[in-house]
């Protein structure tokens, strides 16, 4: 007898094969049969007329704060999502010094429209380093899996303080320290690094985010940390004001480090063909 059988659903297994009607059998924490007619079970979920699919992986979320206090992570868990990735757009809450907690809350509120009052109430700040933050996530029982990326803006503020907040150029020593911390984060389990270079991301005071004007030397230095760790992807959000220049440095970064570089594909009403053009340029640089 199986532990659970999902009975009579329309199964789409994610491989691209046509849908089939059948059962899915689960024993313990493993799916043991997909399709056909499963035997009896301790629990039967009737799925006639419903789709049965693998859990969705949402690669762009901002649960960085909520994941530290909420085991359910609604509404994602209500809609078939079983894995979420956060630390996107260069915003997050680690690494962090006590004196900069308010700045990181302000960034998240301004960039992602998450109320600062909720973040202030919910965050317990049981961490300083990014590995500490991952440990805090691991201690939280939860209904779905989570993964985190180390965000540029907290990293820059942690290393550079007010100079980082004010978008001053990073010194070689700053870059070396950001690289060291990034490598440590990735080795501890971070899925990569993200930054933002878009004018739509500003603080509540209307200032550009700390990493907006980061020079190529800084970004490459951080990217090398991913190469040294042998894992992780480099992600960014950009306005692509100079498309050729942006793609040129992204290509150099990927070739030098051996790590994948991705960017957020967005569109603009004033440039409706932008997303197609960016995809074409991206393919040309593969």
Predicted regions and their residues:
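Histidine/acidic residue-rich metal-binding segments in metalloenzymes
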Residues: 131-142, 167-285
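Divalent metal-coordination and catalytic microenvironments
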Residues: 9, 24, 29, 49, ...
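Short, basic, glycine/proline-bearing loop/turn elements
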Residues: 53-62, 164-167, 260-265
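Short coil/turn connectors at secondary-structure junctions
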Residues: 1-2, 40-42, 48, 52-54, ...
């Amino acid at each position: 007898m199986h532990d659970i059988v999902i009975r009579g659903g329309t199964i789409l297994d994610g491989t691209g094969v046509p849908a089939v009607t059948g059962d899915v059998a689960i024993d313990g924490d493993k799916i043991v049969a997909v399709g056909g007619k499963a035997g009896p079970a301790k629990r039967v979920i009737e799925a006639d007329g419903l789709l049965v699919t693998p859990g969705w992986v949402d690669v762009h979320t901002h649960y960085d704060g909520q994941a530290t206090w909420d085991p359910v992570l609604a509404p994602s868990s209500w809609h078939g999502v079983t894995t979420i990735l956060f630390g996107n757009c260069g915003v997050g809450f680690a690494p962090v010094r006590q004196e900069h907690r308010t700045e990181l809350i302000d960034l998240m509120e301004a960039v992602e429209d998450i109320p600062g009052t909720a973040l202030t109430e919910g965050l317990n700040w049981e961490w300083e380093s990014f590995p500490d933050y991952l440990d805090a996530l691991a201690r939280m029982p939860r209904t779905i899996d989570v993964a985190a990326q180390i965000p540029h803006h907290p990293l820059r503020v942690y290393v550079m303080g007010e100079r980082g907040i004010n978008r001053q150029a990073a010194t070689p020593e700053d870059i070396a320290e950001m690289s060291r911390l990034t490598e440590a984060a990735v080795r501890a389990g971070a899925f990569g690094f993200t930054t933002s270079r878009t004018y739509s991301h500003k603080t509540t005071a209307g200032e550009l985010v700390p990493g907006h004007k980061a020079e190529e030397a800084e970004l490459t230095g951080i990217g090398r940390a991913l190469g040294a760790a042998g894992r992780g992807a480099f992600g960014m959000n950009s306005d692509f004001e100079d498309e050729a220049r942006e793609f040129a440095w992204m290509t150099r970064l990927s070739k030098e480090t051996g790590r994948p570089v991705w960017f957020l594909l967005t569109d603009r009403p004033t440039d409706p063909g932008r997303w197609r053009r960016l995809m074409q340029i991206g393919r040309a640089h593969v």
